[in-house]
């Protein structure tokens, strides 16, 4: 009598199949993570470019002076009646995992900071005061201190608004790395309005370089006008 039953998988065969699936997943996950990181970095640069356009329009209306004052934050001035920024969400980095709102208050996540050195007693300087616009950083992601990428800036932050200075964050402390590429890279917006991906640290031009003009002649001008 002929046996028409299909042969079943043996336990060993099933284990082999599961092992192959596990290997394939372990190979594809890093690729997925890399693609996701690149997409976020691209979106982050796009946000900074939109902030650049908004800031330029604001400065054109205000004698070439940067936003922010002793009574108003730079964020609120850029988003004033949606005149320069259409939505608050542009001020949230894709690396910021917090939920946000369009209220412009304590429920609104702010991920970017303005270079604190453009203010003198909370009064912003004119762009004409910047010695080297091509190397002077104006805006960058403003992280809180810690071993992971995180942010805590809010729409109701104190005037003149959330700032950033080299490897420090406001509010926060000392940041331990960039936002992407295993915290080795960070995007920044410069005073000539170009956006650049920078190394977090190193022997050449780097985000945290402020005291080594030997390997980076422009270091003194990166954070100081």
Name each model-derived stretch.
Residues 42-225:
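Short, well-structured segments within or immediately adjacent to enzyme catalytic domains
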